[in-house]
């Protein structure tokens, strides 16, 4: 394999891994109508299942970053994938809520290391001018899994039990983990880069003392509250509010997820293009972030329009959200030393997943007690604007590649 193509080969492999992770987490929401024929699940219980996944996902997102910084990307990513694949298979053995909740908890634990691992692969192999594009491609894996989930799950349901969905997904993940162990290698210079001129891994307490880190975590908390609600509840909204059956969900639910994939790539491509044209790192990251956030309010109109227009509005919002997501997860690779990239990415992801868990629980309770989807979509549509304002207020000027914010004036910069 040519040396210049190897980084992009690894980016492709990571994209597939993220696709598998999203297929696994989407299997339950897409198949919920079939599962409910065997296991009664209310709106509040559905919210609990998603919150259970997100709670452990949050904890292991933070811990997974530290885990990867300690044992490395190759082994850490493979262990993570194998863990969540086994957890996915456990869903297929469930006959009640107890095992389903346990399976969701274990699934979140495994998937928590996925994006920190992706961030480390990018930091190990690619320069700053290519990282946003690479993260955009990897983030498009979220769409890959989400787009394939409705039609594939619909096909499996036509052929047999909903339980086979989870066994099929688990087999994909275990195959990927074995392949990753065989093919992945760190670049020869990574060992010397990991300390970047003597900078040791930064302790979590010092990271959390930085206003920049707290700003990124807070922004992700808000934006992922919106994203995880849309991700998990879109199929259920189509079932409950629009009267869809599994065949209609299989035909149409993939469309907004496909738009999210285009957003993942487009945001990173646009940011990298601005950098190549000589614009500052600060401008090249923040302009696309702001434009992405401006698309999310489209979901506010969803309950008030026809189903065709609702799918279009979902698509616009999903495009903006995943453009945003890829860009915000690129920021740790820009301004933190490689030795701490996994930890910072983990803390940011922790904030996002905790936001998703809390918002999912709140959504389930609101729907159970008479609130409509209109109220929820109004809140969801406003969160990215607040998140972007927080990011602008806390991030300061993003430094050019090679400038470490923790080395300015010999002390930690927290403003």
Feature annotation, model-predicted:
Residues 75-89, 282-300:
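Structural signature of the two symmetry-related core transmembrane helices
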Residues 103-142:
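Cytoplasmic helix-loop-helix junction between adjacent transmembrane helices
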Residues 40, 72, 93-99, 127, ...:
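Helix-breaking motifs and short loop linkers at transmembrane-helix boundaries and internal kinks
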Residues 1-3, 188-217, 241:
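Juxtamembrane intracellular "pre-TM" segments in multi-pass secondary transporters
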Residues 28-29, 211-265, 321, 325, ...:
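Extracytoplasmic gate region of multi-pass secondary transporters
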Residues 59-98:
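Conserved MFS/SLC helix-loop-helix module at the cytosolic interface between two early adjacent transmembrane helices
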Residues 138-182:
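Helix-loop-helix hairpin linking two adjacent transmembrane segments in secondary transporters
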Residues 333-370:
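A late C-terminal transmembrane helix in Major Facilitator Superfamily
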């Amino acid at each position: 394999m040519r040396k210049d193509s190897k980084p992009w080969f690894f980016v492709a492999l990571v994209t597939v891994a993220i696709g598998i992770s999203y297929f696994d987490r989407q299997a339950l929401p897409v198949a919920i109508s079939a599962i409910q024929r065997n296991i009664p699940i209310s709106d509040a219980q559905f919210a609990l299942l998603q919150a259970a996944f997100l709670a452990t996902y949050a904890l292991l997102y933070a811990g997974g970053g530290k885990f990867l910084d300690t044992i490395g990307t190759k082994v850490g990513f493979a262990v993570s994938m194998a863990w969540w694949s086994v957890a996915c298979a456990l869903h297929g053995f469930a006959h009640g809520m107890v095992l389903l909740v346990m399976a969701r908890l274990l699934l979140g634990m495994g998937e928590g290391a996925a994006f920190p691992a992706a961030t480390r692969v990018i930091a190990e192999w690619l320069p700053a001018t290519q990282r946003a594009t690479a993260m955009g491609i990897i983030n498009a894996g979220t769409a890959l899994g989400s787009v394939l989930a409705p039609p594939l799950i619909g096909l499996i349901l036509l052929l047999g039990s909903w339980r086979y969905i989870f066994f099929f997904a688990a087999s994909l993940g275990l195959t990927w983990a074995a392949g990753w162990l065989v093919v992945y290698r760190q670049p020869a210079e990574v060992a010397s880069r990991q300390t970047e001129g003597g900078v040791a891994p930064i302790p979590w307490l010092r990271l959390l003392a930085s206003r920049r880190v707290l700003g990124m975590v807070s922004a992700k908390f808000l934006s992922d509250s919106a994203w995880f609600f849309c991700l998990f509840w879109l199929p259920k909204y189509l079932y409950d509010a629009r009267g869809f059956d599994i065949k209609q969900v299989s035909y149409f639910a993939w469309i907004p997820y496909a738009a999210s994939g285009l957003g993942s790539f487009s945001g990173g491509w646009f940011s990298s293009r601005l950098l190549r044209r000589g614009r500052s790192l600060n401008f090249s990251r923040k302009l696309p972030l702001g434009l992405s956030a401006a698309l999310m309010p489209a979901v506010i109109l969803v309950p008030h329009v026809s189903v065709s227009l609702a799918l279009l509005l979902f698509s616009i919002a999903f495009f903006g959200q995943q453009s945003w997501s890829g860009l915000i997860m690129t920021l740790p690779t820009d301004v933190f030393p490689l030795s701490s990239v996994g930890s910072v990415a983990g803390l940011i992801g922790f904030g996002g997943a905790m936001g998703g868990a809390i918002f999912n629980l709140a959504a389930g309770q609101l729907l159970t007690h008479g609130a409509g989807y209109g109220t929820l979509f109004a809140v969801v549509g406003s969160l990215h604007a607040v998140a972007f304002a927080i990011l602008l207020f806390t991030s300061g000027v993003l430094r050019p590649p090679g400038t470490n914010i923790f080395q300015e004036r010999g002390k930690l910069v927290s403003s």
